[in-house]
Amino acid sequence: MKLQLIAVGTKMPDWIQTGFMDYLNRFPKDMPLELIEIPAGKRGKNADIKRILEKEGEQMLAAVGKGNRIVTLDIPGARWDTPKLAEQLDRWKLDGRNVSLLIGGPEGLAPACKAAAEQSWSLSPLTMPHPLVRVVVAESLYRAWSITTNHPYHRE
């Protein structure tokens, strides 16, 4: 199974890149994590936010691999603790499809992305900066993988 992280935004601070790459490089060859960055729409004083979201959504959905399960990262989504995420990861593996996780930009996800999703995952009831979500998702997925394989990374 392959994991795709499709995220709005292309110019991340160095500390985000460093943190994300640290976890990306830890993933096993049989479950690689791929980052696909979607350019954020230009936001200005008179920007049409609805149109920007729509365009970002179109680009995100176009980047999803054919037949992939789509999971959105969204505050109202399901809240999985680490053991539940590990169970979810096992279910995804058994499903036999790759998984695309969608992270929206500053205004969130386009309605089309939410409609296309089979699942929605909430990391927290807190609003997080979307660049930080990349690092948190990568670490959470790596930790969940470590539980499913009895790797010593996760400790109770």
Curated annotation (Swiss-Prot):
Specify where it is mainly localized: cytoplasm
InterPro entries, per database record: Alpha/beta_knot_MTases (IPR029028), RlmH-like (IPR003742), tRNA_m1G_MTases_N (IPR029026)
What keyword terms does UniProt attach to this protein? Cytoplasm, Methyltransferase, rRNA processing, S-adenosyl-L-methionine, Transferase
The keyword Transcription regulation appears for this protein: no
Q: Which reaction does it catalyse?
A: pseudouridine(1915) in 23S rRNA + S-adenosyl-L-methionine = N(3)-methylpseudouridine(1915) in 23S rRNA + S-adenosyl-L-homocysteine + H(+)
UniProt-listed Pfam families: SPOUT_MTase (PF02590)
> Where is coiled-coil annotated?
none
Top-rank taxon of the source lineage equals Bacteria
Q: Where does S-adenosyl-L-methionine bind?
A: 73, 104, 123-128
GO cellular component terms? cytoplasm
Location in the cell reads: Cytoplasm
This entry's Enzyme Commission designation comes to 2.1.1.177
According to the UniProt entry, its GO molecular function terms are:
rRNA (pseudouridine-N3-)-methyltransferase activity
Quaternary data: Homodimer.
> Briefly, what is this protein's role?
Specifically methylates the pseudouridine at position 1915 (m3Psi1915) in 23S rRNA.
The similarity annotation says: Belongs to the RNA methyltransferase RlmH family.
> What's this protein's name?
Ribosomal RNA large subunit methyltransferase H
Q: Which organism is it from?
A: Proteus mirabilis (strain HI4320)
Point out the gene that encodes the protein.
rlmH
